[in-house]
């Protein structure tokens, strides 16, 4: 188990999302209530994939203790790449296993769900996602949480991709993973806090 005095959580939000996502806010609030507010980070990830990775890597480089990643949707895709590259653990919530394929169909103008800020998602960004594909994963690194009713992603891709990892599969639900509050204690425990 990680040293509780130093363990940290880095939350990576999904496409068109932000630190204002309800899951990020709830996790941050629960950690603050437990006295760990200073151990939680959720940056605003740029819509450009390589810039998002650079942002996360900068935070990892500054971390004073072991960091566990928590990634939702596209954030789960990023968390996988970072976990394998930097020997970290990660909690994945309805991860975008096939992000280049999924987002390849979304080239164009988008608005952030929380800020309303618009941005262009381009074919170059899809190529950057392809460059972040991770050929294999180390199952022991991961806690996977998926909803079978995810309307955006096929949850079975995640089950296959992270076979052998600790998996929580819920019937129904949707891409937002509405039962997230029930699993916050397990997430915090997995993260070593």
Predicted regions and their residues:
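Glycine-rich phosphate-binding loop signature in dinucleotide/nucleotide-binding domains
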Residues: 3-4, 61-65, 137-138, 191-193
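Gly/Ala-rich beta-loop-alpha elbow adjacent to hydrolase catalytic centers
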Residues: 70-79
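Internal catalytic or translocation cores that form aromatic/hydrophobic pockets or channels
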Residues: 61, 65-67, 88, 93
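The alpha/beta-hydrolase serine catalytic core
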Residues: 88-193
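Short hydrophobic segments within beta-strands
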Residues: 11-15, 70, 145-147
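Aromatic pocket-lining residues of Rossmann-like dinucleotide-binding sites
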Residues: 82-86
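Active-site catalytic motif of lipid deacylating hydrolases and related acyltransferases
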Residues: 5-65
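Short active-site oxyanion
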Residues: 65-68, 141-143
């Amino acid at each position: 188990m990680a040293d509780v005095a130093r363990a940290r959580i880095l939350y990576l939000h999904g496409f068109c999302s932000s630190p204002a996502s309800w899951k990020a806010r709830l996790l941050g609030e629960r950690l603050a209530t437990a006295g760990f507010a200073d151990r939680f980070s959720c940056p605003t990830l740029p819509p450009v994939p390589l810039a998002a990775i650079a942002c996360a890597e900068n935070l990892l480089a500054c971390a004073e203790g072991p960091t566990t990643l928590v990634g939702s949707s596209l954030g789960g895709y990023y968390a996988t790449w970072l976990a394998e590259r930097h020997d970290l653990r990660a909690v994945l919530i309805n991860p975008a296993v096939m992000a280049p394929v999924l987002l390849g169909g979304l080239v164009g103008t988008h608005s952030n769900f929380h800020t309303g800020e618009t941005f262009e998602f381009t074919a170059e960004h899809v190529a950057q996602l392809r460059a972040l594909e991770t050929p294999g994963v180390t199952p022991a690194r991961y806690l996977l949480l998926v909803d079978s009713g995810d309307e955006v992603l096929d949850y079975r891709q995640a089950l296959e991709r992270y076979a052998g990892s600790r998996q929580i599969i819920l019937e129904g639900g949707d891409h937002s993973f509405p039962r997230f509050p029930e699993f916050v204690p397990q997430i915090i425990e997995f993260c070593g806090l």
